[in-house]
Amino acid sequence: MRVSGALFLQFLLLVVPHISCWNDEAVLLRDVQVLTLYRGRYTTARRSSPVPQLQCIGGSAGCGSFTPEVVQCYNRGSDGIDAQWECKADMDNLYRFGRVEVSCEGYNSPNDAYVLRGSCGLEYTLELTAEGKQQQGSSGFSGFASNFFQGFSNQKQQQRGGGGDGGGPYQQHSYQNSPSGDGVGGLLVVAFLLLVAFVVYKMFLCSPTNGHQGFGGDQGYDSTNGAWDNSQGMGPPPPGFKPDYYSGDHSNSRPGYGFSDSYTRPQSSWTGFTGRTRPGGGGGGGGGFWTGMGTGGILGYLFGNQRRQPPMGFAGPTYNSNPSPAPKTSSGTRTASGFGTTKRR
């Protein structure tokens, strides 16, 4: 009787650790030969929460630049610790896999040799190839501005997309792909452009201040023959844009080799180099600049709205046609590979 009890105990010790293999949801990881993972799908979960099957975690290309549709990972054997994987996907020639890691949920614990069926996903970094780095370096500010204005246009279309009447076969569908951060990014870019315009205006177009009286003919410049009169002991001014930046000795001198005098003194209060003022002349030299810029912006906005506005009375169907950001041009696509190990959760 004691012998039979000892044998039964040994049988339990041998069988109980492998009971999980009788469960259809538990899979021995070393028996998994291929994983096919899709963009937009999630893994199964038992002890934790589902995670995306394809999850970018960084890289020089940025996670928002490209996401493969399908990735297949092949079990290439074990390094004595865990399974090693080779993952392949069709990618644009601008991008490549960096670090890849297959993440699976252990059935009973993170250290379990069995994993939950369907719980494996891929974490990867997305890097730029040599072609991608070259194109990124040549894009500069133009690509940034193009993406900004396209995103702003998409946001305006999204705001108009939900205005249709409900219930009919021609009900309008709202747009869903516009990013929520376009508004904040747009304000930042507009503020930056206004700052640049203000700096250019102050440096090159602003009228003289602090008592500068232009370039009178009795202050060292002979208006009759265009020569410089050095009788007052003042040399010609240094080259520059505005007399405001000169020293006190040259505050009343003729402008140097920068912009013409029409940009460095009030337009409405001087008739030339004679020092005479017009009757009732004003002093605001920047009004035309700001007025022109504001008028152009308003007209451009209204013209763009008219081009995108559908005809009145037309209630035809609209579709989710909000365009995605324009892709970068490249020489084509190829099958990219990445190599990595296993992570358990």
From Swiss-Prot:
Where does it mainly reside? endoplasmic reticulum
Question: Does Transcription show up as a keyword for this record?
Answer: no
Q: What residue stretch is flagged as signal peptide? A: 1-21
Classify the source by domain of life: Eukaryota
**Swiss-Prot/TrEMBL GO biological process terms:** calcium ion transport; regulation of store-operated calcium entry
Positions of the UniProt region annotated as Disordered: 155-178, 223-289, 302-345
Q: Can you cite an annotated GO cellular component?
A: endoplasmic reticulum membrane
Q: Does the keyword Cell membrane apply?
A: no
- Give residue ranges on the Lumenal side: 22-183
Instruction: Give ranges for the Cytoplasmic compartment.
Output: 205-345
Per UniProt, which keywords does this protein have? Answer: Calcium, Calcium transport, Endoplasmic reticulum, Ion transport, Membrane, Signal, Transmembrane, Transmembrane helix, Transport
Topology in the membrane?
Single-pass type I membrane protein
Compartment(s): Endoplasmic reticulum membrane
Composition-biased stretches (Polar residues): 223-233, 318-345
Give TM regions: 184-204
Query: Where in the sequence does UniProt note compositional bias of the Gly residues kind?
Result: 160-169, 278-289
User: What family does the entry list?
Assistant: Belongs to the SARAF family.
Function in brief: Negative regulator of store-operated Ca(2+) entry (SOCE) involved in protecting cells from Ca(2+) overfilling. In response to cytosolic Ca(2+) elevation after endoplasmic reticulum Ca(2+) refilling, promotes a slow inactivation of STIM (stim1 or stim2)-dependent SOCE activity.
Q: What is this protein called?
A: Store-operated calcium entry-associated regulatory factor
The organism encoding this protein is: Danio rerio
